[in-house]
Amino acid sequence: MTQCPFTPCADGLILAVRLTPRAGRTGLDGVRTEPDGRPILCLRVAAPPVEGAANAALTAFVAKSLGLRKSEVTLVSGETARTKRLHLSGDPQALAARATAWFGGDGPGS
């Protein structure tokens, strides 16, 4: 199985994402391994990459998928790049369980 594309931190998780904007529909494309060996969650959104629309759609989709408020999902890095890092606020263990159930990866350290 694929490793999880997240790292626990004191107040939540950091989630590594590769985003495809302007897709036919918003959805999950699974977990892939980057050339450097790091796992990354591949997502697509219908919104175009204009004036932050794709990033807003990304955070809203992740929040809805994990049962979080939109304010609990923030973009940490990659504002104009396809590869992004999101901070998910909450209990790291509970978030890890929800995230793993959502995309079907292994837990941290597996």
Curated annotation (Swiss-Prot):
Report the domain of life of the source organism.
Bacteria
InterPro entries linked:
DUF167, YggU-like_sf
Record's GO cellular component terms: cytoplasm
Question: Could you tell me which NCBIfam families the record lists for this protein?
Answer: DUF167 family protein
- Cited PANTHER family: UPF0235 PROTEIN C15ORF40 (PTHR13420:SF7)
Q: Which family does it belong to?
A: Belongs to the UPF0235 family.
Name of the molecule in the record: UPF0235 protein Mpop_2087
